[in-house]
From Swiss-Prot:
Protein's recorded name: NADPH-dependent 3-demethoxyubiquinone 3-hydroxylase, mitochondrial
Residues annotated for Fe cation 1 binding in this entry: 60, 90, 93, 178
Lineage, highest ranks first: Eukaryota, Metazoa, Chordata, Craniata, Vertebrata
UniProt entry tagged with the keyword Mitochondrion: yes
Region (2 X approximate tandem repeats) location: 48-217
Pathway: Cofactor biosynthesis; ubiquinone biosynthesis
Known partners and oligomeric status: Component of a multi-subunit COQ enzyme complex. Interacts with COQ8B and COQ6. Interacts with COQ9.
InterPro entries xref list: Ferritin-like_SF, Ubq_synth_Coq7
Keyword NAD: yes
CDD domains assigned to the protein according to its UniProt record, in alphabetical order: DMQH
One Gene Ontology MF term: 3-demethoxyubiquinol 3-hydroxylase activity
Family the UniProt entry places it in: Belongs to the COQ7 family.
Species whose genome carries this gene: Bos taurus (Bovine)
UniProt cofactor(s): Fe cation
Length: 217
């Protein structure tokens, strides 16, 4: 498919947190940019890219819901601005993956409504344990996401990395920001949370299940 035809098709729709809406001018530029740099719908491994974009979109959506839950409980406390800053970065991540979903015609996971509820509940629930509980959740989730992004980087590097240069740049940038969030959590007493090791292990086990399901459903 030519860039012009891909652009014409993409202009008909846009994804915002799982809903299809008309594509904005910004989304159109994203589609053209990827076409012009060599990463088109024709010359990529569609199955691999579909899985990567779908699961990353779901992960960033879930992260947004977690931070929303934390802010609902701790937004007016001293840790509120710290959580808000991390949440703002996660909003940028989600926006980018919304655009990539449109540009590469990737459907969202069918589990979006489930992650909506579970993410908020996890964020609010751990925040009810106090600042330390919220930060423990942040450490567990961000560590899992960073590890997941590293796996994706290795996968794309094995599949003619020059074709996926821009996608690799996005994933690497977001991986680094997730690691920053991880370190912020540790700096704000995550390890002082009640039953920290158990809590972290349970959350990370849930993250593994979420990644597995979101790639496939």
């Amino acid at each position: 498919m030519s860039c012009a035809r891909a652009l014409a098709a993409c202009c008909l729709w846009r994804l915002r947190t799982g809903a299809l809406q008309p594509l904005s001018a910004y989304g159109r530029r994203i589609s053209v940019r990827f076409c012009s740099s060599g990463m088109t719908l024709d010359n990529i491994n569609r199955e691999a890219v579909d899985r990567i974009i779908r699961v990353d979109h779901a992960g960033e959506y879930g992260a947004n819901r977690i931070y929303a839950g934390q802010m609902a409980v701790l937004g007016r406390t001293s840790i509120g601005p710290v959580i808000q800053k991390m949440w703002d970065q996660e909003k940028d991540h989600l926006k980018k993956f919304n655009e990539l979903m449109v540009a590469f015609r990737v459907r969202p996971t069918v589990l979006m409504p489930f992650w909506n509820v579970v993410g908020f509940a996890l964020g609010a629930g751990t925040a009810l344990l106090g600042k330390e509980g919220a930060m423990a959740c942040t450490v567990a989730v961000e560590e899992s996401i960073a590890h997941h992004y590293n796996n994706q980087i290795r996968t794309l590097m094995e599949k003619e990395p020059e074709k996926y240069e821009e996608l690799l740049q996005v994933i690497k940038k977001f991986r680094d920001e997730e690691l920053e969030h991880h370190d912020i959590g540790l700096e704000h007493d995550a390890e002082l949370a009640p039953a920290y090791v158990v809590l972290k292990s349970v959350i990370q086990a849930g993250c593994k299940v979420a990644i597995y399901l979101s790639e496939r459903l």
